[in-house]
């Protein structure tokens, strides 16, 4: 399906990856370097509608609905949402579009992007992360930082049985409140709000999204329980060897600066840039500023 928007050719298509359906949005010309865009919770490939057109003169933007989201396939079992399955999806998508790419991940998409960069480094030419976390610094923050522990308590609520039912009630009132807590959500209104509601669909759609939290082995201490020791993680196996850009909206209330502390020891080619007056949703709030930094870096 082809459409014109602001002089830009945009395409959407359905592909098969490992025998499963994936929905892709693309912007720009396939002859350009590929930029794979991985959304987080609770978004979908339409999350890039503001940013991708600003990049597409120089890169070919490819954005999938990830497993369990939007129009892509939605497994019902929890095992299917473990990180190695999510990475396998992205490997298949990259093989479909050419084999390697610049990879950009936000939120949960950042977790997949980091895992891909560690397990399949030749497929990631450059790595861009926006308000997302490498597993080692984040797990350390969840053991050592009272502020990050407090900020991450919502994960326990999401992991509860039946949380998806509460999230869909009253036209997704709780879901919208959860990802707007303490942050600027003026961008989520009108047609965009309608698009998000459509992407979430129903209770089964929201359950699939929440299953990403249920399937992860991330240790999040509870506020009323003793903190267990830092789980063993082998730093030598978690290095990010390719050029790495970390973009950050400093007013994020879910992921605090402690969540990326020490990242430079794992990423020798790290560059950090903070976007003023933005929070977790920087790609919606200041897409022009984000695009300028990305284009100057790549």
Map each language-model feature to its residues:
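Alpha/beta-hydrolase fold catalytic core
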Residues: 1-35, 56-60, 98-100, 268, ...
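Flexible "cap/lid" subdomain of the alpha/beta-hydrolase fold that forms the substrate-access gate
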Residues: 20-22, 34, 62, 69-104, ...
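Conserved HGGG/HGGXW glycine-rich cap/lid loop of the alpha/beta-hydrolase fold
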Residues: 26-74
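A short, glycine- and basic residue-enriched loop/turn
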Residues: 45, 111, 278-279
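Charged catalytic carboxylate motif
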Residues: 47, 89, 208, 289, ...
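Short, hydrophobic alpha-helix immediately C-terminal to the catalytic nucleophile
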Residues: 49, 114-118, 291
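A short acidic, amphipathic alpha-helical/loop segment
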Residues: 50-51, 259-262, 289
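Catalytic histidine-centered segment of alpha/beta-hydrolase-like enzymes
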Residues: 278-287, 291
